[in-house]
Amino acid sequence: MYQLSKEPGGRFIEMTENYRSSRLVVGAANDFVKSVRYRLKTAPILSMSDDDGEVRITRHISKYMFLPVADDIMKRGNGTTCILTQTNEEAVVMLALLNGRGVKAKLIQSLEGLRFSNLMEMRYFMKCVDRRKQSPLIADEAWEEAKQKAFSKYAMSKSLQYVRRCVEMFELTNRAKYYSDLREFVFESSVEDFCDVSDAEVVVSTVHKSKGREFDNVYMLISDKFNHTDDLLRRYYVGITRAKHNLYIHTNGDVFDSIHNCQRIMDSHQYAVPEKIVLQLSHKDVYLDYFKYSKQEVLALRSDDELTYKAPYLCCAPTGKAIARLSQGMIDKLAKWETKGYNVASASVRFIVAWKSKNAAKEEKELAVLLADLKLRKV
């Protein structure tokens, strides 16, 4: 964009009027963004709202801030509410904590860089569409048949909701359905694109996944354990600007000290980790080659199905057969949690995805990789 502005006849025009956020929220954003270097925009944003709103920053000395954030959420006002965290692990912990308190919270789910097109349920739907391919245009009959087969086969899968939402959105934007358009739409999408949080009392998300969304009340849980790079500061700025009316920041660092016109609270309490912790496994947390021996068993599972944990294996609950093996890194991580008094209480299927090694032969078939949730409980 900077280079384009320097082209002959090029001009850089800043849009400075904000009709979305309250005055104090916009003021906080203006104060904070001054700490970000190398920005194209230089003019401060002007709030066109009549609402002052509220900005409150709570500075903690505690390493863990889950409990005070949850307490704060229980006192939330009217309107849509979101909690923004830095990591997926923090987001899942907050989700479990709020659900345990009776709050209908939903997580903006992610596959951590994995393609939505590799999701088991999505793969099956695409195969059903491909089987009826006769021209570049998808016939209405073939489309409805693919929907019926996929929705029926995976009716008990929690992940089917993302496929349903994907199909609905494609139908809304494509009156005539072409194979090429469908493939491009699915290939370029991610799971979070199809997270329907419209009926949630509280939405939980990482700051990274919140871009493009807005909420009346935004709570930010920011642990000061990362280097304050420009990229990180830009993420925090995105988080701040998600708030329409009220912004509440919980932090144990000084990164938000540049915000002036706000309420500040000093909390000297030491808070424990919640009694229940959820760890979401990714590819690096399991031995991928182990799935060569359990493909059919994995494909028979559905998202949210119960698993049993017999270290270092995840087993199919009805049969007890081992279908996944944890990596050494994950075993070491669990050992650290054990020193804090936590043990694996239960496990369940989160996603099943197609995977193939980059070094695999062309004719080698893809594996079905199980990505699970491990629920830890303090003994």
Indicate residue ranges for each PLM-predicted region.
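Residue-level preference for the first positions of well-ordered beta-strands
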Residues: 54-56, 80-82, 201-202
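Core RecA-like ATPase module of SF1/SF2 helicases and allied nucleic-acid translocases
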Residues: 23, 84-248, 253, 257-270
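Short glycine-/polar-rich loops that comprise or flank the Walker A/P-loop
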Residues: 7-12, 52-54, 79, 214-218, ...
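Conserved active-site motif detector
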Residues: 257-379
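Short, polar/flexible loop-turn hinges at active-site or ligand-entry regions and domain interfaces
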Residues: 10-13, 37-40, 79-81, 106-109, ...
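Short active-site oxyanion
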Residues: 79-82, 320-322
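Conserved RecA-like helicase ATPase core segment
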Residues: 1-53, 57-59
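Conserved interdomain hinge at the start of the Helicase C-terminal
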Residues: 58-79
